[in-house]
Amino acid sequence: MKPTITSWADEVEADYVDGLPPSKEHVDGDYKHVTEYKFNDEGKKIKVVRSFKIEKKIVSRAVAKRRNWTKFGDSKLDKPGPNSYTTKVADEILMNYMGSKDFEHTQDPLDASKPIAKCRICNGEHWSVKCPYKGTSMDIESKAIAAATAAVGETNKAGKYVPPFLKEGGKGRERDDSSAVRISNLSESMTEDDLEELVKKIGPHTKMYLAREKNSGLCKGFAYVHFKYRKDAAEAIEILNGHGYDHLILSVEWSKPQN
């Protein structure tokens, strides 16, 4: 049988099906140099030479096993390692650099140190709808004071009723904190359920308030508990003050009246 005689042009065309020479790799010590050919946006053939530093490191067994997985899809015939045509090692991050003048215009006109929200019930740094005292006696008192204050503006009109606690420049009834205690040095992970578990065995309580950070929602480190009876509040101070809880030493004292 006679050997088939082929043209050298056919052999070249078979090697370079897409008109580009195959990529080449050259290892020089700890560096690997990869030479590739491709077409740019203008349709011109260009040569791209990339250099990689070879590093050996110890990885977990799961990572080593994952690197031996069989490639599929467009990367089915690729060599080990990422292919720049089908794989992105990292996400592209676009950055816009601003000048000093542009930065001044973007400054928030509001003072960042001042709270944006203020509760009308307890004057805390949160919205009234999220107040822990909503629906309690404190909420009822605040609504009564607001309604009575509006009525004071019309005291000159005959027949208008003014509550006794607002007459003669009165500032309203003070909240009864005689059976309230302040628990401080709490951990950031403290929750209302943890606080309930901490004080429920001492005695019945009417309400609790766990102070939280406005942005993160973590505990600020203190809380208030209003016991039903003053003797239970005194017992809570005696039991919990200096008590170790969540790797911290609690400090419990009588709640001081607000000015």
UniProtKB/Swiss-Prot annotation:
Pfam families: eIF3g (PF12353), RRM_1 (PF00076)
Biological process per Gene Ontology, one example term: formation of cytoplasmic translation initiation complex
Family annotation (PROSITE patterns): RRM
InterPro entries registered for this protein in UniProt: eIF3_g (IPR017334), eIF3g_N (IPR024675), eIF3G_RRM (IPR034240), Nucleotide-bd_a/b_plait_sf (IPR012677), RBD_domain_sf (IPR035979), RRM_dom (IPR000504)
Keywords: Cytoplasm, Initiation factor, Protein biosynthesis, RNA-binding
Predominant subcellular localization, coarse grouping: cytoplasm
Location of this chain's protein in the cell: Cytoplasm
UniProt xrefs under Gene3D superfamilies: 3.30.70.330
Domain RRM as annotated: residue spans: 179-257
Cytoplasm keyword on record: yes
Gene Ontology terms for molecular function: RNA binding; translation initiation factor activity
One Gene Ontology cellular component annotation held by this UniProt entry: eukaryotic 48S preinitiation complex
Similarity-based family: Belongs to the eIF-3 subunit G family.
Function: RNA-binding component of the eukaryotic translation initiation factor 3 (eIF-3) complex, which is involved in protein synthesis of a specialized repertoire of mRNAs and, together with other initiation factors, stimulates binding of mRNA and methionyl-tRNAi to the 40S ribosome. The eIF-3 complex specifically targets and initiates translation of a subset of mRNAs involved in cell proliferation. This subunit can bind 18S rRNA.
Subunit annotation: Component of the eukaryotic translation initiation factor 3 (eIF-3) complex. The eIF-3 complex interacts with pix.
Protein name as it appears in the record: Eukaryotic translation initiation factor 3 subunit G-2
Naturally occurring in which organism (per UniProt): Drosophila mojavensis (Fruit fly)
